Every structure is written in C-alpha cells, then in structure tokens.
Amino acid sequence: MTDSGGGVTLSGGEPLLHPSYTLELLAELGRRGFHRAVDTTLFAAPEVVRSVAAACELFLVDLKAMDSAVHQQYTGVPNEQILQNLRMIASFSPSAPEGHPYRIRIPLIAEVNASEANIAATASFLCSLDRKPDQVDLLPYHDIGKGKHERLGTVYNPAGLSLSAPSKDDQARCLRQLADAGLTVTIGG
C-alpha cells in the first residue's frame, strides 16, 4: 500500500466506542505499512482520543452543530466533550506522536446547522484552536442510506426530523464564511 499512497479509514458507527479493538486494528495496520485514518465524532473519553491519535496518521472529525442543545436534539448527545477533544487534538504538536493532520467534516443540513450563525460560530471555534484543521469539508445532506434501512426493515429517520440539503446558494455562503475566516474549505470532501 505504500506505493499507492492508499490506506484504511475506520469509520461508523463510531470507532472510538470500541477503543481496544480500534487500537489493536490500528497497530496491525501500522505494522503492515498502511496509512491509517479515523473518521470520528470524538465523542469519547480524552484518554481514548489521545491513544487513538498516537496510532493513526489522520483524524476526520465530524462537527455537526456548535449549539449544544441543537447538537443534543439531533444527535442524542451534547457537544461539550466533542469540542474539548477537538481542542486537545488541535493542541498536539505536529512533531508529537499524536500530532497528525486533522480535517473537519460538517454534514450540512438546511434546518439544522447551515445557518449563518452556526457557520460563524464554527469558524470562530476552529480559528481559536492552537492548530487549525488542515481542511474543512462541507458535506451536503443526502438520504442515500434510506434504501439500505428499507431493505433492513429499520426506520431511517426514527425521530421524523425534517432533513434536507441546503440550497446551492446556502452551500456557497457556508463555504465563503469559512474561507473568509482563513480556513481551507471544500464542498463534498
């Protein structure tokens, strides 16, 4: 894999919910020469985040909403632990074992987190970190997983929440807001 630049990304559910397995898998992948990325919400104990950070080369961090009450409403958990862990990984020196690049991934949902206020709060928070993210990826909402849930006989949106992608104009506004704050931003990752 070192010739191709390829690697392995551990993702959801949430790999940090299973720290022993995640660390064991990351160690084995490292022994085999794979680049290791972890796609996470960072909703975990700080010691778990620190251990995983030392065992991978890249964090892809989902950041859903800056207002903790909104975050709780749409995800079931508040965001304080997530923001604390994000501050921690941003504080790691690039020369430290834990100090790898990290990217922020924002699933943009029109009615939830694509407002000017939330994006401004996100930009302010990210710019306040010791080390800014290497990139911010805006990921417009989609319902691709809906068919999978139907095939499995599970409910796609159990809370019946109104979910839709922001308009192209709103996506462009979100990108501009973050870029104007000095962040490197893409739409679609």
Each PLM stretch: what is its role?
Residues 165-189:
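A cross-taxonomic marker for long C-terminal extensions/tails that follow the last structured domain
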Residues 114, 118, 162-166, 170:
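Short amphipathic alpha-helical interaction segments
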Residues 151-160:
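Short glycine/proline- and charge-enriched loop/turn segments
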Residues 1-150:
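Conserved AdoMet/S-adenosylmethionine-binding subsite of the radical SAM
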Residues 34, 154, 183-184:
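Short aromatic/hydrophobic-glycine micro-motifs
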